[in-house]
């Protein structure tokens, strides 16, 4: 029997080509990814204030690359995203708050939005890594479900994601979003080299190191989510805890 995940993802069909969005800037991509992430991880404080959005953009965990952007940079990115209808500002609060409109604009299911957000926040990842990293946004039944949605995203015209060539010594292909434009093989090779710090390691040792790093990252992310939730309940700016 076909799962709901797979049946949803198999509806790519013969859809008409959508109007292409202009490529997002790095800060626009980070802002969009943070809005999607925090919608699920800290729903009590969503839509996000500018301060909370800045904290999410600049946090040191679960981000690749780590950024240090100013509120002025974020406001400029928000203006650009508003022009694409990907972000809008809520009108029910005295403090400006922002939310994304990604699912409607891109016309993709929520599962695909979760995958795109994680690719925006963490860069190229395998389907297995995406299943793990999106756990707080959407619970995929298995890796095959993730791959089905990735294949569907890749089938759009123009595509939203691309499967990258397998890196030397890697067991799986990684996926990368195309919301910031096309990616070159050379650029991906540079990214892979930065990920490993240019070091050479045996495949088994490298896989173990990656697994250990991923486990630590997930623990820190869960603790951060708890802190963000508690700070929201207490009305305390979350950056006081994260600086």
From Swiss-Prot:
Name used for this protein in its record: UPF0502 protein H16_B1091
Organism: Cupriavidus necator (strain ATCC 17699 / DSM 428 / KCTC 22496 / NCIMB 10442 / H16 / Stanier 337)
Location of region: Disordered: 1-23
InterPro entries: DUF480, WH-like_DNA-bd_sf, WH_DNA-bd_sf
UniProt xrefs under Pfam families: DUF480
Similarity annotation: Belongs to the UPF0502 family.
